[in-house]
């Protein structure tokens, strides 16, 4: 079967802009990740294997075809978060799934959904494990964390009103870890990853929505469960998750010390 005759509808991101509280947002995000990993990925792998076999059956050996055949060998065994294309370094699934979130303005979130791409030109993508339903975190604190993690592009509060949830591919590099302070005075680990820009390449987005960070540092959010602080941090990406090969050793940075020094 010729590769060009194959077609697969890419994953449709779950629209969570109407989520009404942090627990609802958590449940919907978790459900979206499960649908992709346990349902859609099976259809995706079947498509990739058929596409790869079609490429490997080609008798032509021109340089572009050789590159496609190298890609075909990879896609027979690994989920790829974008359609098959002539690239040297595809966005492949990691050995252990890594759920990350990219924070962006509402306008840019719409652009991502319309163009089905998380990269624009050579602009790097900054992602974090910190979940958007964390109402115990203040928006201003998250802005400072992003600016410390990636000072090459300064962000302001409107730039973190929206989010997209994705699986981090093998092209996302572990950047560093920060410790942010929540409204209860407790430190929370915040891990950042960065992916260098590769042009407008398609990428499967799992979900999108509006963040629920607290905008007023003087207002204490009401816990969604009967405890001083909702323990939601372990549900999507827990600290017991094994570090993957190729990850740089994290640099622990205390956000308070960083900001006070400036």
UniProtKB/Swiss-Prot annotation:
One Pfam family from the record: RolB_RolC
Superkingdom of source: Bacteria
Alphabetically ordered keywords of this record: Hydrolase, Plasmid, Protein phosphatase
Top-rank EC class of the record's enzyme: hydrolase
Region ranges (Disordered): 221-262
EC number of this enzyme: 3.1.3.48
Gene Ontology molecular function, alphabetical: protein tyrosine phosphatase activity
InterPro entries registered for this protein in UniProt: Glycosidase
Catalytic activity: O-phospho-L-tyrosyl-[protein] + H2O = L-tyrosyl-[protein] + phosphate
Primary role: Induces differentiation and growth of neoplastic roots (hairy roots). Seems to function as a tyrosine phosphatase.
Protein name (Swiss-Prot/TrEMBL): Protein-tyrosine phosphatase RolB
Gene name linked to the record: rolB
């Amino acid at each position: 079967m010729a590769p060009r005759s194959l077609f697969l509808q890419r994953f449709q991101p779950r629209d969570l802009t109407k989520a009404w509280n942090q627990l609802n947002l958590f449940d919907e995000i978790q459900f979206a990740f499960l649908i992709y990993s346990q349902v859609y990925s099976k259809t995706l792998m079947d498509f990739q294997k058929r596409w790869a076999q079609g490429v490997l059956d080609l008798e032509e050996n021109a340089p572009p075809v050789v590159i496609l055949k190298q890609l075909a060998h990879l896609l027979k065994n690994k989920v790829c978060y974008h359609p098959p294309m002539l690239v040297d370094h595809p966005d492949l699934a990691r050995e252990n799934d890594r759920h990350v979130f990219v924070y962006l303005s509402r306008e840019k979130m719409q652009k991502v959904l319309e163009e089905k791409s998380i990269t624009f030109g050579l602009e790097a993508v900054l992602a974090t494990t910190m979940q958007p339903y964390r109402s115990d975190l203040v928006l201003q604190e998250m802005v400072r964390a992003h600016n410390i993690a990636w000072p090459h592009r300064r962000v302001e509060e409107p730039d973190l009103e929206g989010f997209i949830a994705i699986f981090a591919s093998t092209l996302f590099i572990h950047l560093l870890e920060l410790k942010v302070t929540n409204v209860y005075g407790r430190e929370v680990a915040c891990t950042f990853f960065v992916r260098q820009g590769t042009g407008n390449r398609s990428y499967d987005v799992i979900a999108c929505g509006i963040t629920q960070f607290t905008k007023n540092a003087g207002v204490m959010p009401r816990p969604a469960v009967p405890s001083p602080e909702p323990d939601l941090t372990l549900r999507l990406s827990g600290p017991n998750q094994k570090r993957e090969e190729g990850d740089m050793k994290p640099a622990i940075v205390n956000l308070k010390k960083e900001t006070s020094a400036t």
